[in-house]
């Protein structure tokens, strides 16, 4: 019996999972690692610690599954996207910490490039908004702030990679320096139409071509693990960024299919097929995966604060002891009692992109209780996801959503999922396996080696846990949305004219 090992390198922890042919989890391990905050709005990770934690959980997951390395058919890698590492080609030693996707230190670089009108070129070629979220300006910052780095980069002495590339390089012990199209599409350096690193983009961001990894499909054999690591040479056969792997793991393989991941934030992706659609409504167009000589594109919208609003009620206001208690408290009242909660703790993401918005709880009366506020907080997650899907309808011609597939921690909340179905007026479907990110990477690897035969087989493995059908009267829904939009209006631009944030 053979298995697939999935490496899931996330923002706060490194995980590994072993799957069998029926997509059942046979072994699992997870290890958290250090978050480094050198100054406000800066976020870093130690790449060596990431690799060490990842190596540890791979061995642990195999032990938990009671299998030997030679029983692994292939390895798939999925990762936190955009996070940037630069290391020495000869020694494999990082020249600086990894700069994490959440890091805002390059915001001023982005502002300057916008003043020069570069954001329009970047949007047309990459499908991305010009923002410090993506890798391009992070690379620029490291090369300009680490002594001698730019010269060494131009001499071909350094390697750049997103986290997938860093893990691959270490698994193969310096033999493979490559990335997949999905991760590359989040760097600001890949032309998503030609599928090549783009000279004009490299020139705008002042990034030397010599440091870039080779571009490959997401489902192909990248190389093998070095025998010294596990005592076996295991093919590494699948790579995709986390939200793209989750889209694949949800079997959203046809154009028009959509998934939403309800984690700390929410990430909503819609498969838009084989042709990119560039959104002028501040949604992101990316490559979800490349396989069989073609790529699939997605449109993505992200909500900064999703499940994190419930953590805040738990830790900041001490409304309940466990996040899972939120559902019972919110269900103890029949509606939000006129209370609306806009959780713009760090501004608003898509489709507003307002970094000056701040959190707002509005409509409170003497009769409001913590149950109403908790219900309003849960509803805010669904309202924000509704706003993204509504914007997607404007960007995608003839787009009518049939069902929304859901995963992530907060997808276990039945009240929230029912409210989401009511707002969207479509089915919300939760699968049996909600570890869709790791599963997607496993599928991509297994398809490359023939462990799974076809996309149809992947679709057949996807199983429903629960379907939520819309049941709210239209006039009630419209009233809720009208009030939500009023509340968002109050939260927007809150600190625009003040000096504090």
From Swiss-Prot:
UniProt-listed Enzyme Commission number(s): 2.7.1.30
UniProt catalytic activity? glycerol + ATP = sn-glycerol 3-phosphate + ADP + H(+)
Keyword Transport listed? The answer is no
Q: Where does the chain bind sn-glycerol 3-phosphate?
A: 11, 81-82, 133, 242
UniProt: ADP binding residues? 11, 15, 264, 307, 409, 413
What metabolic or biological pathway is this protein involved in?
A: Polyol metabolism; glycerol degradation via glycerol kinase pathway; sn-glycerol 3-phosphate from glycerol: step 1/1
Regulation acting on activity, per entry: Inhibited by fructose 1,6-bisphosphate (FBP).
Task: List residues binding ATP.
Answer: 11-13, 264, 307, 311, 409
Name of the featured protein: Glycerol kinase
The alphabetized UniProt keywords are: ATP-binding, Glycerol metabolism, Kinase, Nucleotide-binding, Transferase
- Keyword match ATP-binding: yes
Spell out the Pfam families in the cross-references. Answer: FGGY_C (PF02782), FGGY_N (PF00370)
What domain of life is recorded for the organism? Bacteria
């Amino acid at each position: 019996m053979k298995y697939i090992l999935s490496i899931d390198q996330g923002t706060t922890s490194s995980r590994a999972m072993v799957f069998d042919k029926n997509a059942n989890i046979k072994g699992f391990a997870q290890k958290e690692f250090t978050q480094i905050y050198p100054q406000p709005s800066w976020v870093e990770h130690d790449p060596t610690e990431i690799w060490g934690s990842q190596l540890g959980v791979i061995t642990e997951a195999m032990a938990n599954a009671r299998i030997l390395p030679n029983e692994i058919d292939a390895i798939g890698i999925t990762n936190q996207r955009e996070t940037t590492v630069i290391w020495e080609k000869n020694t494999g030693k990082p020249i600086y910490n990894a700069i994490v996707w959440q890091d805002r230190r390059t915001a001023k670089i982005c502002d300057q490039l916008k003043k020069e009108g570069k954001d329009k070129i970047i949007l047309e070629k990459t499908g991305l908004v010009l923002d410090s979220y993506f890798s391009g300006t992070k690379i620029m910052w490291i090369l300009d702030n680490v002594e001698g780095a730019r010269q060494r980069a131009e001499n071909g002495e350094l390697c750049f990679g997103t986290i997938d590339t860093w893990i691959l390089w270490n698994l193969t012990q310096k033999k493979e320096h490559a990335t997949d199209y999905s991760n590359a599409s989040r760097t600001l350096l890949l032309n998503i139409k030609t599928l090549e690193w783009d000279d004009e983009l490299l020139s705008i961001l002042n990034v030397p071509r010599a440091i870039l990894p080779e571009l490959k499909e997401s489902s192909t054999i990248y190389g093998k693990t070095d025998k010294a690591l596990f005592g076996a040479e295991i093919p590494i056969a699948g790579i995709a960024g986390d939200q793209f792997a989750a889209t694949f793991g949800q079997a959203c393989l046809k154009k028009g299919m959509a998934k939403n991941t309800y984690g700390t934030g929410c990430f909503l992706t819609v498969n838009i097929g084989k042709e990119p659609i560039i959104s002028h409504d501040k949604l992101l167009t990316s490559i979800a995966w490349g396989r069989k000589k073609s790529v699939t594109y997605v449109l993505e919208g992200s909500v900064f604060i999703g499940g994190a609003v419930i953590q805040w009620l738990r830790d900041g206001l001490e409304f309940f002891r466990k996040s899972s208690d939120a559902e019972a408290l919110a269900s103890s009242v029949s509606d939000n009692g006129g209370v609306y909660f806009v959780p713009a703790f760090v501004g608003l993401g898509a489709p507003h992109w307002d970094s000056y918005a701040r959190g707002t709880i509005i409509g409170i009366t003497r009769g409001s209780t913590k149950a109403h506020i908790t219900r309003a907080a849960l509803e805010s997650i669904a309202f924000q996801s509704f706003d993204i899907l509504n914007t997607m309808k404007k960007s995608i011609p003839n787009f009518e959503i049939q069902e929304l597939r859901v995963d992530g921690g907060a997808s276990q909340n039945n009240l929230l999922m029912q409210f989401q179905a009511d707002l969207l007026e479509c089915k919300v479907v939760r699968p049996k396996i909600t570890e869709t990110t790791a599963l997607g990477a496993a599928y991509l690897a297994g398809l490359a080696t023939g462990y799974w035969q076809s996309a149809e087989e992947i679709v057949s493995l996807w199983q429903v846990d629960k379907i939520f059908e819309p049941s709210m009267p239209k006039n009630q829904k419209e009233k809720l949305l009208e009030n939500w939009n009023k509340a968002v209006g109050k939260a927007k631009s809150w600190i625009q004219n003040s000096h504090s944030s």
